Each structure stands twice: as structure tokens, then as C-alpha cells.
Amino acid sequence: MIFDVHVHLVGMNPESGCYVSPTLSTGLIYYLFTWELGLAGVDQENVDEAYRDQLVTWAADSDLDGVGIFAFDGVYDDLGHYDHERTSYYVPNEFCFDVCEYSEKLFPVASVNPMRRDAFDELERVSEAGTVALKLLPNSQGVDPGDRRYEPFWRRVAELELPLITHTSFEHTVPALDQSFGKPEKLRPVLDQGVTVIAAHCAGSGVAHPFEEDFGTWLAMLEDHPNLWGDISAMASVSRFPYIHKVLQSELARERVVLGSDFPVPVAPMVFSPQLGWSKARELSQIENPLQQNLEVFRALGVDDGILHRGGELLRLPDGVGD
């Protein structure tokens, strides 16, 4: 099955338990977000439902067989208490599970910050509820994956056979508390506990950080860690487009990556005009469904079926799905 493992859920209505900081929910960022999704003019209290309905429609109308939908845990202090002041973005696991009930193509990816006091209890709860993986964005959630205090947590994640989809390298959208937490080498203690780790963006630092590269570290780590993978999310966007070429040029990388989009990050087909030609890039730009557009851009660039299908093989899908 063709599986996009990397799609973000957006919720802004406090009644759903979601939270987006004023930095992200006002001004230019919010305008561009709503305009890109066709949600301009939708009241913020109605954005949750409108975004959900768009996701359901786009997934149904795409060639994708499955889409991993992310919850997003908040920031926690050293005592394990939720830190609202430092949290920029929060999507509760329960909200994520509820949204995924609207389509058989949507699969919940829960988020559990290992710093929270009830981390083990929440991990067990979401595992029992059917999460197919866990999501972490260390830079913005204030989590150092290399901190050995969390090894028992990661050990339990491995026992539950839940893969971890974690952001790597620099974060560009959600305000970062510590960019060093995204370094791929920080994942070694997690990998050593036996967790299957999917490094989002293959640790590509992005065009904004051309002299601070982490992709090579991730690529080298593949040799030592058979449970380390990567996803190609955002590699069809302006921010990380050079990295799809790096992945496709490496036989090892091609064998260890899965499909992702990083939706709602916009796809930018025109940046691939030198490879695809202006006419083909323009044709891809006309695709209105962003999930399908991301898929078609990667197909045009030579992403093979192994990459497109591999994500579903790594996730802990319900029995009978994908058979």
C-alpha cells in the first residue's frame, strides 16, 4: 500500500483541546496557511472541522492507501508538568484519534513527550487505542533524545513495536526551543533500545542552513543502525528540495526511506524545472490535491515503488490492513 507517513493535524478550537500560539495563529503565517488550504475566511473556531474535511477529501481522492496523521504533544517542565508558556502548538492524542475515525485511509500517530509525568501511562493508553507510531519534534517540544533518563521509555516503545517518527535537523515552522535536539546523533540511545526510528527529512538541514549539514551524519548512521530509516517529507517543498536528489543518488538511502509529505507544508513543483522541464513542472503545479501533488512530484523525479510502499511496512498497522 502507498503510505504517506507524515501529515500534520491542525486544531485551533480550544473546545477540541488544541492550542496554537499567537505567533502561529495570527499574521502572515496564518494567512498563508489558510490561503494555501482554501480556508481563507473560515473562522478560527471552525478551522478544525474544515481542515479535517479537506484531509478526508484529499486522502479519498488520492492514490494513497494510507496517511499517518500526527498528534503533537506540548512542552513539559523538569517536573513533568505541562508548560503552556513554552508550548507553541498542541494537538491532543484524543483529537487525532477522533479525526481518523472519519476515513479508513487516516491512521493516528500519537505524540507522547517522554518528559511528562504520566509518559508511560499515556504511552500504554495510545498503544492500546491503536496508534500506528509515535511522533516527536524534539527541537520544539524541548526533548533531548540523547538524554539517557528516557531510555526506559524508549525500551517500552520498542517492546510495543511502535516506530518513532521524529524530526531531525533544523526546525523551520514550529518555534524551536533548542535546535541541537534535532541532531541525528542524538537518536543513538533511542536506536540502542531497539526502537525503529524514522528520521523525518533524513536530517536535511534545509536551504536556510547550507553550511550546517546533518544529512551526511544520518546517511553514515544507516550503516551502524539497521533500525534507522528516513522519510522524504518536505523534499518537494522550497525549504528542503535539494535533499530528494541526495536521497536518490545514494543506493543505501533509497533502500531506507519512506514516503512523506509534511502536509500542510506547500509542494513547490517549479523548483524542479531544471530536472523535469518547465512544462512538466507547470503541469504538476496545476494539481489541486496537495497529497496527490506531492506523490506525483516524487514519481516524476524517479521515486520508486519500494519507497512509496515501505512506510506501511514499518508502521504498526491494525491486523488485516495492507494484506
Residue ranges and their predicted role:
Residues 8-10, 72-74, 111-115, 137-141, ...:
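Active-site beta-loop-alpha junctions enriched in small/polar residues
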Residues 3-7, 67-69, 107-110, 132-136, ...:
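Hydrophobic faces of well-ordered beta-strands that scaffold small-molecule active sites
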Residues 73-180, 244:
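Active-site gating/metal-coordination segments in enzymes
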